[in-house]
Design a protein with these regions (language model features):
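Active-site catalytic microenvironments in core metabolic enzymes, especially phosphate/sugar-handling
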Residues: 1-271
């Protein structure tokens, strides 16, 4: 199967994606290249690209951008000033991929909104919150799950017990640990606007670091007496990479996909 056919399939099944505006694309590589083996990973880091090349994959499917910008990542690197350090590293990264023949495909918008198996659904199942959200925000990837009442700290401990398996054994918490909560907002990536969760009737929110910085969203939540649990961006989307790998294996004849774990982006070091 050609790389372009895999990309076009995702656009064809994602009617919520505007092809003219989506960040989903073949970032690097020949769209006409035949793909037999693909590796699926959360972000196309240099390490992940090297892994793909060293292990003979034809395609790397990434959820996040290759060149550190959400929309026009490659163009921004190529047009950056000649003395830009980002440009230097970006062009080195680009050259490595081009010389290898690897195809880099970004699948972000399609997988964020894929019902039941996409990013927020996979995250909720991983956390044990359920399979069907009680409410979904207008942008599709902010969900509310109604669960049996428990204290905020009990919920945080329950989440940490799950995320420990992918490298994050502790989570950040804002709010009274004894507060009883049951209507839980969850989101990943940039889809973590806490005001939206409040409007959805949530009494606590589970967000990620890239989508909720402290001095803006989270401090507003604290001042509004709305509890927040925060994890790393990579942690929250790892379960969705597992489901994406399975989807590729189930959908594309002649293509074998393998999952390259990423998990929490940080090592956690104590005293």
């Amino acid at each position: 199967m050609k790389a372009i056919e895999i990309y076009q399939h995702f656009l064809s099944v994602a009617d919520w994606v505007d092809p003219a505006r989506t960040v989903d694309k073949i970032t690097l590589g020949d769209p006409e290249a035949e793909v037999h083996r693909a590796v699926v990973t959360w972000i196309s880091s240099f390490d992940a690209l090297r892994y793909a090349v060293e292990h003979g994959y034809d395609m790397l499917i990434t959820h996040e951008p290759t060149f550190w910008d959400n929309r026009n990542d490659l163009a921004n690197i190529e047009q950056a000033p000649a003395d830009s350090l980002k440009r230097e590293v970006g062009l080195r990264k680009k050259r490595f991929v081009e010389e290898s023949g690897l195809v880099v495909l970004r699948i972000h918008d399609a997988w964020d909104g894929m019902p039941e198996i996409g990013i927020p659904w996979a995250w909720a199942r991983f956390l044990g919150l359920g399979t069907r959200p009680a409410a979904i925000g207008a942008v599709r990837y902010q969900h509310r799950y109604d669960i049996e009442p428990l204290t905020l700290d009990a919920l945080a401990s329950r989440i940490a017990a799950r995320t420990a398996a992918i490298g994050e054994p502790v989570v950040q918490v804002i709010g009274d640990g004894e507060r009883v909560v049951s209507k839980i907002g969850i989101g990943t990536g940039c889809g973590c606007d806490i005001e939206t969760y409040v409007r959805m009737g949530c009494d606590a929110s589970v967000v990620c670091d890239d989508g909720s910085c402290y001095c803006f969203n989270i401090q507003w939540a604290a001042d509004n007496d709305h509890p927040v649990i925060r994890v790393n961006h990579g942690t929250s989307e790892e379960p969705g990479m597992v489901t994406l790998t399975q989807y590729v294996n189930d959908t594309f004849d002649g293509v074998t996909a393998e999952h390259l774990p990423h998990g929490c982006s940080f090592r956690l070091v104590g005293a």
